[in-house]
Design a protein with these regions (language model features):
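Phosphate/diphosphate-binding glycine-rich loops and adjacent basic-rich segments that engage nucleotide
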Residues: 90-147
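Short glycine/serine/threonine-rich phosphate/pyrophosphate-binding segments
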Residues: 37-49, 69-71, 112, 138, ...
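Acidic, glycine/proline-rich low-complexity segments that act as flexible tails and inter-domain linkers
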Residues: 1-39
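A glycine-rich phosphate/pyrophosphate-binding beta-strand-loop-alpha-helix module
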Residues: 42-98
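Single conserved hydrophobic/aromatic residue that forms the stacking wall/gate
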Residues: 172-182
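Gly/Ser/Thr-rich active-site loops/lids in small-molecule metabolic enzymes
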Residues: 145-159
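General beta-strand structural signal in soluble alpha/beta enzymes
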Residues: 30, 59-63, 84-88, 102-104, ...
């Protein structure tokens, strides 16, 4: 996929998503990752989102259940007994009042319910691994985004630029400790 193809797919998903309207839009941040690193890797984007919120950054944490690993953001938050079924206005209120709100992807991207079963059946990574972190329904313009393979850093960076991101930090961690890059 090229950055132009990713941009088109992101815009299509964003246009059909249920929006979260946050008053503090200007400095809203999302910490999200593509997943797809395998079963031995842990979810760090959710912890990073809480650290950012503790530092008084407004966080619209967009995430889902795992498709290929041990824990997606939703799996982690569900294990902590948090309500994943918040409506858009409730998520916005959480962001505005406590600094963080969780946007459970399957509740805000209704069309994706047709894709998830196929994603779980395949061992291959798909374009949907890349689209998830780019389709935040609160339209966060600042993002910390992890990718499963370093080859996606430039196309995802170009896609974020195409989408009007104000600031972005792209991360890649290899499953092998000898091949870690930023």
């Amino acid at each position: 996929e090229t950055s132009d193809e990713l941009t088109g797919a992101v815009l299509a998903m964003r246009n059909s998503s249920i929006k979260v309207k946050v008053k503090t839009q200007g400095h809203l941040v999302d910490c999200c990752g593509t997943g797809g690193l395998g079963k031995s890797m842990m979810n760090v984007s959710t912890s990073a989102a809480f650290v950012a919120a503790a530092a008084e950054v407004k966080v619209a944490k967009h995430g889902n259940r795992t498709a290929t690993g041990k824990s997606g953001s939703a799996d982690l938050l569900e294990a902590a007994n948090l309500n994943l079924s918040l409506k858009p206005d409730q998520v916005a209120k959480c962001i505005e009042e406590i600094g963080i709100g969780f946007i459970f992807a399957q509740n805000f991207h209704p069309g994706m319910k047709y894709v998830m079963p196929a994603r779980k059946r395949t061992a291959n990574k798909t374009i949907f691994n890349l689209l998830g972190p780019l389709t935040n329904p609160a339209n966060a313009k600042r993002q910390s985004l992890g990718v499963y393979d370093s080859k996606w850093i430039l196309p995802v960076a170009e896609t974020l630029k195409n989408l009007g991101a104000h600031k972005a930090c792209l991360l890649y961690t290899s499953p092998s400790p000898r091949d870690t890059r930023e």
